Every structure is written in C-alpha cells, then in structure tokens.
Amino acid sequence: MNDSDSERGWRTRQEAFSGEEDSDEPTYFKYSATLRIFGTIPGHDELTGRLGIEPTHSHRAGERRSQNSEPYKHDMWSYTAPVNKHEPLHVHIDTLWSTFRTRKEYLLQLKKKVNVDVFLGYRSNCDHAGLEVPHTSLAIFLELEVPFGVSIIVT
C-alpha cells in the first residue's frame, strides 16, 4: 500500500486477500450465543423460576444502563452460553441449545406473549474472513422457530 492509499484508509484487493494486516495486533475472532426474552415480562423471578436458570443479564423497562444512557424500552431476560469467546460459533450455539432444549415447549408458549430469539455475535479485527456453522448446530433455530442471524462487528 502506498502512502496515499494509507491516508485514504483503504487497501488494494491484493492486500486485502493476501492476509497482510495493517497493524501489529494479532488477528482475533470472538463469538457468542445468547437466548433473549424481551417485551413486557410480568415477573423476572417467575420467568427465572420456570426456566430454572439464572439470567446472565436482565433489566426492566425504564431502567438505564448508566446515568447518561437512554432508558430501556422493554424488559429483557437473557442468557449467554458460558463458552470461551474464542471457541467456534457452533460450540456456543450447541451449548445454548443443550441448556434450553428441555425447555422448548415453555419457550414456544412464551413466544405468544413476548419476543424470544437467539442473538449470535461475531467480532474480529479481520475484514476478510467468514464463519461456518454445521447443519447439526441449527436445531435451536428450527425448534424455536426463530431466524438465524449474526451480529458482525469488525474493528
């Protein structure tokens, strides 16, 4: 990359696909899988009791993340699979499903009153990579009748 390209903040196609990185920071990939239940939740404690699992995060509508942040618009109960962020995405998904598989019917009933989804996260400092999820790891989406979507953040 020449100096004028560097100043514009972009790389040639050859540089992008060569695996050369502009920084000395090692390439990383991080993943997560979270079951989210949100909307108007009458009782977080009751929900937690019925699921038999403590949420990794929860909040009520009107609460704030910090003093200067906007208030939350809805209640949230969420559980993130306890997997090392560097493990492949399918490990996160499989762990999440193994936690909630036996609670499927209750989650389907909940969907009639509140939103239930699976939030997948993919974060990397590499702008020329992808991810792969084996078909065997897609059962949670089929069984809970929720879309497969991934939040992708490249830093």
Residue ranges and their predicted role:
Residues 1-131, 135-136, 143-153:
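Acidic (Asp/Glu-rich) sequence patches and key acidic residues
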